[in-house]
């Protein structure tokens, strides 16, 4: 198994994407600490991977003291951290009509929570001389607003990718890798969204593969990126957009 004897933390583990990554880590042999804001959602994920759960904790990933206390509560090594915490975003409004607060909010959210979680764990990883920090971006970081009015979400994702590169440059000498995942829209993370058929068709036609990524695929890619097989990869953004964005 790719992650046997590894210890991972997943922030935002109660969400669809965080849960998918937690399950993938568990399937590859990791002990997984689940953290998020809603206990019931975390417990639902924990019930799927009972043998792999290290702990379940209610943690506000926007609060530095909450995250620092959580990291300190975990004994021994921390090999992997993944942040899947959602941001507050207003979309489907033209930029020229969007308020400053609505534009800036997702950028602040993304920068704050990823900075807090990654630096809290990086301090431990620097001491132990190794580890992997994973962040979640989106193809929105590379797309225009010609088809969809994304508000501040594009800039939020771009900030995550910038942080990935900056942190990778700083902590690499300690054996710590930093990688971002950039999927396109994943329909199975939002089954409650009623997307019109023509809208979904437009999304499909905009990809080289003619389909959209699935959350399980993102989870398995995260597991690979966190494994020793991906040892040379750092400061990189893994393109999981099915070709919606071509690097």
Indicate residue ranges for each PLM-predicted region.
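Catalytic loop of short-chain dehydrogenase/reductase
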Residues: 87, 134-159, 164-173, 185-186
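Catalytic Tyr-X3-Lys loop
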Residues: 96-116, 130, 134, 160
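Short, small/polar-rich loop/turn modules that mediate ligand/substrate recognition or access, typified
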Residues: 172-177, 233-235
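A glycine/serine/threonine-rich, flexible loop-to-helix segment
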Residues: 149, 173, 180-207, 217
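Conserved mid-core segment of classical short-chain dehydrogenase/reductases
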Residues: 86-104, 147-152, 192-195
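Conserved glycine-rich cofactor-binding loop
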Residues: 14-15
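Alpha-helical segment proximal to the catalytic Tyr-Lys
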Residues: 123, 169-170, 231
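Short C-terminal tail/terminal secondary-structure segment
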Residues: 223, 234-247
């Amino acid at each position: 198994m790719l992650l046997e004897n590894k210890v991972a933390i997943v922030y935002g583990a109660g969400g669809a994407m965080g849960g998918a990554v937690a399950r993938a880590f568990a399937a590859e042999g990791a002990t997984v600490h689940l953290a998020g804001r809603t206990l019931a959602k975390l417990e639902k994920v924990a019930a799927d991977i009972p043998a792999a759960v290290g702990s379940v904790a209610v943690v506000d990933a926007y609060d530095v003291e909450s995250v620092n206390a959580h990291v300190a509560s975990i004994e021994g090594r921390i090999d992997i951290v993944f942040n899947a915490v959602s941001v507050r975003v207003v979309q489907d409004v033209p930029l020229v009509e969007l308020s400053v607060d609505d534009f800036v909010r997702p950028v602040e959210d993304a920068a704050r929570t990823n900075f807090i979680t990654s630096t809290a764990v990086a301090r431990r990883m620097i001491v132990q001389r190794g580890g992997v920090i994973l962040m979640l971006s989106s193809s929105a970081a590379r797309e225009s607003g010609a088809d969809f009015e994304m508000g501040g979400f594009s800039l939020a994702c771009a900030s995550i990718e910038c942080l990935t590169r900056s942190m990778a440059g700083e902590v690499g000498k300690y054996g710590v890798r930093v990688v971002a995942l950039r999927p396109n829209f994943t329909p199975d993370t939002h089954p409650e969204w009623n997307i019109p058929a023509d809208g979904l068709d437009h999304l499909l036609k905009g990809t080289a593969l003619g389909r959209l990524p699935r959350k399980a695929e993102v989870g398995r890619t995260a597991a690979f990126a966190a494994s020793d097989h991906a040892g040379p990869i750092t400061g990189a953004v893994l393109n999981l957009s099915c070709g919606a964005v071509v690097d």
